[in-house]
């Protein structure tokens, strides 16, 4: 049934007796529309007008106490008979806190308020949610209890605390580093494969002044000193960048030279492993940053086998061999 529309009218008279008589003799005409015959072409066949006695209307109202009526204007009402679907979307609020009440709570309260007041309700169910840490701990304890033999006895000490979770063993050394790549200050020497190098060396060396300029510098560069030494039968090359006046730059090494090696090539904007263009101090000819170690003016044969190198100096790892 789609709906019941009351079409009967109320005629108000001046006399009280006539009004009571008319109310007793009043009949209600109801317009009924059938939804089962919607496919019929004739519209009059799906619409009927019924007459409902007052006694049946009174019994209908008493049998449906939850039925609602909307007053459009005096004398005409719309009775909403299908409340089953509309009641599903209605939410009940808690009488204490105003939050949404539990659906099955007979006291119309939320779980917290209903439980705090001590009401006997079926919604007082303990939550089955377990934190992740406790679940992981239970799984580990179950795994240790199921593991047999020496595995169970060895892991029993770790799980004896209950709350302590065994962790992985962490390597104290950083990834990508090794003890052989760092030179400790207290070590007397460094051994790499078959070669053995001293921890500190001191000797005379020839430093050549060169002008360093990058590709994006636009011709502006800075002066640096380049040298090549022989230590332990191996050839080492390096460039010493200008670090500024001695008063503004505190040297970290024990040498008294005004020019120190840069740890990352920050002084000239270039890196020793990616050398920029080198220009000689006197001439304007640009050349690559490679010097022949066998030249008499640059490398002396009577040079001692050791030379002083302050800590932090970087060299070419693979120098060209003649």
From Swiss-Prot:
Tissue: Expressed in seedlings, roots, cauline leaves, flowers and siliques.
DNA-binding region, residue range(s): 94-121
Record keywords, A-Z: Activator, Auxin biosynthesis, Auxin signaling pathway, Developmental protein, DNA-binding, Metal-binding, Nucleus, Zinc
Listed InterPro entries: SHI, SHI_C, Znf_LRP1
Residue sites binding Zn(2+) 2 per the record: 94, 110, 114, 121
GO cellular component: nucleus
Annotated segments matching region Disordered: 1-25, 132-196, 247-286
Protein's UniProt keywords contain Oxidoreductase: no
Amino-acid positions noted as binding Zn(2+) 1 in the UniProt annotation, renumbered to this chain: 94, 97, 105, 110
Residue spans of biased composition, Gly residues class: 147-163
Domain of life according to the entry: Eukaryota
Subcellular location(s) of the protein: Nucleus
Biased composition (Low complexity): 247-263
GO molecular function: DNA binding; DNA-binding transcription factor activity; metal ion binding
Compositionally skewed regions (Polar residues) per UniProt: 175-184
Cited Pfam families: DUF702
Phenotypic effect of disruption: No visible phenotype. The double mutant sty1-1 and sty2-1 has a reduction in the amount of stylar and stigmatic tissues and decreased proliferation of stylar xylem, as well as shorter siliques and rosette and cauline leaves with a higher degree of serration. Hypersensitive to 1-N-naphthylphtalamic acid (NPA), but restored by exogenous application of auxin.
Renumbered ranges of motif Required for homo- and heterodimerization: 231-234
GO process annotations (BP): anther development; auxin biosynthetic process; auxin-activated signaling pathway; pollen development
Disulfide bonds: none
Family membership: Belongs to the SHI protein family.
Cited function: Transcription activator that binds DNA on 5'-ACTCTAC-3' and promotes auxin homeostasis-regulating gene expression (e.g. YUC genes), as well as genes affecting stamen development, cell expansion and timing of flowering. Synergistically with other SHI-related proteins, regulates gynoecium, stamen and leaf development in a dose-dependent manner, controlling apical-basal patterning. Promotes style and stigma formation, and influence vascular development during gynoecium development. May also have a role in the formation and/or maintenance of the shoot apical meristem (SAM).
Protein name per UniProt: Protein SHI RELATED SEQUENCE 2
Species in which this protein is naturally found: Arabidopsis thaliana
